[in-house]
Amino acid sequence: MKQICVIGVGYVGLVTAACFADLGNRVVALDVDEQRVANLKKGTMPIYEPGLEELVKRNTKSGRLSFTTSYAEALKGVEFAFIAVGTPSGVDGNADLQYVDAAARSIAKNMTAPLIIINKSTVPIGT
């Protein structure tokens, strides 16, 4: 069993977190949107994906999946941190990487031991 943090609970992040938890890992899914996290804790899904609601509820109930807004809580004891935050297009058409940058900085500030960081967000080549 691995300890995993997934940052961002949109389509990519929530599906990733739920699937890793269903494989038997302990997953903490983090989002800075307090309302989104509160809704997930109540079982309200922010997106639709066939089977996702059941997957989230089953793994939350088993204790393998939890949700938080706290980087310190989410990163405690984890081996892997997945960044799955939005990268919207800027007015010039380029990817806006501010959320990826903020997540990376927050990981650096709050990690207590070495960990592997995996970026699942869409970013330009060479980023």
Predicted segments with their positions:
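Structural/interface elements that position substrates and couple domains in central-metabolism enzymes
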Residues: M1-T127
